[in-house]
Every structure is written in structure tokens, then in C-alpha cells.
Amino acid sequence: MSLLAAAIPSTSSHFSAPFLPSFRMPRKSLTAPLHRIRRPRPFTVVSSVPDPAAGPVEYTPWLIAGLGNPGNKYYGTRHNVGFEMVDRIAAEEGITMNTIQSKSLLGIGSIGEVPVLVVKPQSYMNYSGEAIGPLAAYYQVPLRHILLIYDDTSLPNGVLRLQKKGGHGRHNGLQNVIEHLDGRREFPRLSIGIGSPPGKMDPRAFLLQKFSSEERVQIDTALEQGVDAVRTLVLKGFSGSTERFNLVQKYKFHRV
């Protein structure tokens, strides 16, 4: 039984596990033992409708995963801004990331009354799918509620973009996640602009480089804005506010 199912009161029949597309996962991912630092807090499912006769309310969990590399030497580098965003989200929502499962460091909590799983894969960037695929299956998270957060060299430093779906854009971590979701690409993503390598600089060296002081200010501002964007997405879904957010982000550094 999943933690989500365990959290559903036995007196209610209104909640059911969400539909989950089939994922291709290595057998070893399913049978690997779980090593917990502390006992995780189960998903909490709470109805916002005070009168049960008013109708059933379903709260489908979200899996919010930031992509990056584990280890202190990667902390603060361009390629790890996905990790930083997840850390900010967890801190703002009071979620403690204290569980190791499926090659991930994760925390279980909620945004508003919506259950969320915040995740930092520990399998290294290029193998992020080995962590996210099994977690999505174990917690029965539908594809439309898997939010990936990652760095994007096609966007100026500190510019964010929120999308319902898309390709991998030659991002190795994102590509590996798609492969472990059976080639499916219809999941949300929040990309964080880190700029592009100057001149003939090696792209790998650029990704593993830390931000300049000016760039760091822009990234910190973007992380704050990203937390608000994720909260709005989880509570309200994609809407006109998403389009306005992307438009504001696109021109945030333009001078008129």
C-alpha cells in the first residue's frame, strides 16, 4: 500500500488512486531496499468542502523534482539550480527532506492542502530518470503532475519559463527522465535560465562553474519568483496567470 493510500481515511470512499501511465523501469529499481534517515510523513489528504454532501473532492499528489548533481563540489554551480529551487520550495512550505528512496533525497508534505513530494535525485544528472520513474510509479503520481525543474542554457541568466510539456532540448538529465517515463513528454517543467557559454568555452566547464556575484543576485531573485510560480501551479493548474508569468519573465531584463 502506498503512503498516499494509507493517508486516506477509511470512512470516506470519495478518494481513489489517480490513473498512472505505464512506465518502463529496471527491475532493480523496484526491488532496491529503502534506507530511511527518518520515518517519512505520509501524504495528508484534506477536503476543503466542509459538507461531505457537497460532493467528492480529489487531491492528486504532485512530484516536484529538481535536477542536479549530489555532492558539495557541485553546490552553487549552474547545473544545480534545480536542486536550489527544490530546497527553496521545501523551506517555504515547511517540508523536511529527510528520506532516501529510489536513489533520491525526498520530503513529503503539502502546498496548501495538495500533497506534494519534493525530490532531489542522487543518481547524478545524466541518470535522473532512474530516480524519478520509480518514484512516480510508487506514489501513483500521474504524468501531468510530475514537475521537473532544471537549468536551461537557451534562456538568459535568471529568466524562468513554465511549460505544460516539451522535448528535452539536449538536456541530458531531462532526456533520461523522458526515457524512464516510457518516452512520454507530457509533463510540466520549470526551466531556469543560466545563460550560455561565452565564446569558445567548453559547455561542460560552463555548467560546472559557479555564478558571478551579479549572476547570483539574478538567480536568487528567480528562485523566489519560482517558488511563487510553483505554488500557483499546484493550487490552480495552468491558466492565464501562467501565460502572464512567462511573458513577464521573458522581458524582465529588457529596458524601454
Curated annotation (Swiss-Prot):
Tree of life domain: Eukaryota
Transit peptide: 1-45
Binding annotation for tRNA: 74, 124, 126, 172
GO CC term, one of those recorded: chloroplast stroma
UniProt site positions, description: Stabilizes the basic form of H active site to accept a proton: 151
GO biological process: mRNA processing; RNA splicing
Gene3D superfamilies in alphabetical order: Peptidyl-tRNA hydrolase
Record-level Gene Ontology MF annotations: peptidyl-tRNA hydrolase activity; tRNA binding
Main location class: plastid
Coiled-coil features, chain-numbered ranges: none
Protein location: Plastid, Chloroplast stroma
InterPro entries: CRS2-like, Pept_tRNA_hydro, Pept_tRNA_hydro_CS, Pept_tRNA_hydro_sf
Residue numbers annotated as active site: 79
Keywords: Chloroplast, mRNA processing, mRNA splicing, Plastid, Ribonucleoprotein, RNA-binding, Transit peptide, tRNA-binding
Family named by the database record: Belongs to the PTH family. CRS2 subfamily.
Oligomeric and partner information: Interacts with CAF1 and CAF2. Part of large ribonucleo-protein complexes that include group IIB introns and either CAF1 or CAF2.
Function summary: Required for the splicing of group IIB introns in chloroplasts. Forms complexes with either CAF1 or CAF2 which, in turn, interact with RNA and confer intron specificity of the splicing particles. Has no peptidyl-tRNA hydrolase activity.
Full protein name: Chloroplastic group IIB intron splicing facilitator CRS2, chloroplastic
Source species of the chain: Zea mays
Lineage: Eukaryota, Viridiplantae, Streptophyta, Embryophyta, Tracheophyta
